[in-house]
Swiss-Prot record:
GO terms for biological process: selenocysteine biosynthetic process; seryl-tRNA aminoacylation. Pfam families: Seryl_tRNA_N (PF02403), tRNA-synt_2b (PF00587). It comes from Mycobacterium tuberculosis (strain ATCC 25618 / H37Rv). This is Serine--tRNA ligase. Its EC number is 6.1.1.11. Pathway: Aminoacyl-tRNA biosynthesis; selenocysteinyl-tRNA(Sec) biosynthesis; L-seryl-tRNA(Sec) from L-serine and tRNA(Sec): step 1/1. The gene is serS. GO terms for cellular component: cytoplasm; plasma membrane. CDD domains: SerRS_core.
Amino acid sequence: MIDLKLLRENPDAVRRSQLSRGEDPALVDALLTADAARRAVISTADSLRAEQKAASKSVGGASPEERPPLLRRAKELAEQVKAAEADEVEAEAAFTAAHLAISNVIVDGVPAGGEDDYAVLDVVGEPSYLENPKDHLELGESLGLIDMQRGAKVSGSRFYFLTGRGALLQLGLLQLALKLAVDNGFVPTIPPVLVRPEVMVGTGFLGAHAEEVYRVEGDGLYLVGTSEVPLAGYHSGEILDLSRGPLRYAGWSSCFRREAGSHGKDTRGIIRVHQFDKVEGFVYCTPADAEHEHERLLGWQRQMLARIEVPYRVIDVAAGDLGSSAARKFDCEAWIPTQGAYRELTSTSNCTTFQARRLATRYRDASGKPQIAATLNGTLATTRWLVAILENHQRPDGSVRVPDALVPFVGVEVLEPVA
């Protein structure tokens, strides 16, 4: 949720953010109206409750002759209070709906526009232009690493098995990411992958893209698409001690996405699948520290990308492609030779106070007063990275060189085609 103080004092800033995202600025006026209506209803109800309390006291001290009219008035006030409290509930519901409809206010400097309006911040390494390169699926099958056919037989399209050294490659990648996180002060976690609806709402995943989420019918739970969700809910309703700096967590989990809006996109291989594994960094900090923490998360992602030795670029994602919770997002995209394009391997988002406000996560400032915390998240490794590793390290004979950092996990320096 956005900050109501900002909304009331500078609604134009919120309107500009909405326009940069390509979203409706009229939602800002709708929230202002709902906010004013809610406050008016609360004021009326409070006045009636005070009058009812005074009337009740006067009845107790009245003489028998004075009591009948006072009792009638007390009864009238009780009915009015009941009606006013019903109005409060209705006004609160309308206000909450209007509040939830507005995306986070973007950070200054975020490019306006949609998916193609990003800004390139850095390019690392030279893209490889191989003669007749094989794609990751052809390589994965010939090397005995990926089995899409049996994945589809067991579970349907966009499912797969990682087998043999394919499984070791992914496990090694995730262990490498977790070690990097722990070495930098992250607390390792293996979180639940089924969460309550209020946690999904709190993180912003039941908004415009709710159709991407798997729901477990009958249990009222949702499968997460990232461990950002349970980690954001981890401290919901709590007051944190941030006096010694940010709290950092690394979540290792399976992730699930319906890919409902991706019909016909990336149907080959493991670029876009329904289930994958990921190590996600998550940070709680003060709002003043959020931008610095965002840069640090990006730095750790870049360290991981250096370890898998692939060319990549860093982009500043445009406002219309941020998602509702992020105020700014950096993506790292690796070069994929067979596509002749960069594809996303990591995202890191500064969600400012948007998620924490929804989830009632606070900290105490220097004076001891509770304030809304800031939250950030960032990918440290995921299954899709295998695509970049296989394609960028393939050799003319069909083998693939294992990046040096992953050799201890995989057990060989070169992945050879299986008979």
